[in-house]
Amino acid sequence: MRKADVIIPTFKPGDKLEKLLRRLLEQSVPVGRVIIMNTEEKYWDAERFESLFEGEDTKLTVCHILQSEFDHGRTRHEGILKSDADVCICMTHDCVPYDRNLVKELLEALDASERVAAAYARQLPAADCGVIERYTRDFNYPAVSRLKGKEDEDELGIKTYFCSNVCAAYRRDIYLKLGGFTKKTIFNEDMIFAGHAVEAGYQIAYAADAQVIHSHNYTAMQQLHRNFDLGVSQADHPEVFGRLHSEGEGIRLVKKTAKWLVENGHALLMPQLVMASGSKYAGYWL
């Protein structure tokens, strides 16, 4: 089986990072190194996090950068360049592996075909996740795995390029061959890379059995800002997003969510859905 390292950008890390690191050390297939790309050294608790790796076969590397130096694409890319593993798994510091088989399932997904350039995990809602966000998790991360390539664009549209660095594994040789993540982006470095990979003839694997716990309860204003960043990143990369637009997928999600709310006794949440959807749409088009 391929050797894997994990790359995690951090900023003011806390309890979730500690839980994430503990779960990584418990994996049925151990990783070689965890590479932390930490923004601002003053927020890093070395005693708390680095002591977890004492006596472990998995090693920890911590690289500190300034907040002004952070970029979603470049910072992760620099972390991958510090690895010599066959596979680099990108994770965010607020996700937690669901079980001991996360790494194993990601590696098996990459081995499904020589064409697979990346594999991303299923995101399960946290215990405090709201009803609407819980349904959104299920919509975007179903229970069935699949491979996605250029031949699926007519069926899947923009979701052909969907990939999430909340937890995604990359074959390092293909990653470097394609130039890696874009070096300047406020968002979406994962989908931009996936789009380029698909256009180059590779596939993206959705590994439903590789699972992490990760969800957010965004306010309307937070959702607006998030979708503004999403819209900017898509506008900056028409070579990826110019042919396959995301509006149709968003409308489908709203319709299916509304139907699910009514059918499952949550009709009183319809105003919340309207506000959240309006914030997403406004942010995207600002």
Segments predicted by a language model, with ranges:
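Glycine-rich, basic loop-to-helix element that forms the pyrophosphate-binding segment
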Residues: L66-S83
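Non-catalytic, C-terminal membrane-associated alpha-helical segments of glycosyltransferases
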Residues: R226-V232, D236, V240-L286
